[in-house]
């Protein structure tokens, strides 16, 4: 397994993106951050990375990270460039993810 890249998050120019943010099976209190209409079942880190690359967000994959609300679930996370607010960035990714799943 590849080593997790070290990414500095102290500045306001990067955003953490967890697959849980896009999971249709989760409620808002369980970590979903996008509207149900844009959420998908079982979002994968590889899908999110591919979409973030297409959007020019310079994604960094960290596979060994665990979403704090579900620490037993080792799906990893992405670190992406902040080009808009976190909410707008997540909505952009969610729209592309939904399109990709429906095609």
Curated annotation (Swiss-Prot):
GO terms for molecular function: 7S RNA binding. Gene3D superfamilies: Signal recognition particle, SRP19-like subunit. SUPFAM superfamilies: SRP19. Its main location: cytoplasm. Keywords: Cytoplasm, Ribonucleoprotein, RNA-binding, Signal recognition particle. NCBIfam families: PRK00754.1 (NF001973). Belongs to the SRP19 family. This is Signal recognition particle 19 kDa protein. It comes from Methanopyrus kandleri (strain AV19 / DSM 6324 / JCM 9639 / NBRC 100938). The gene is srp19.
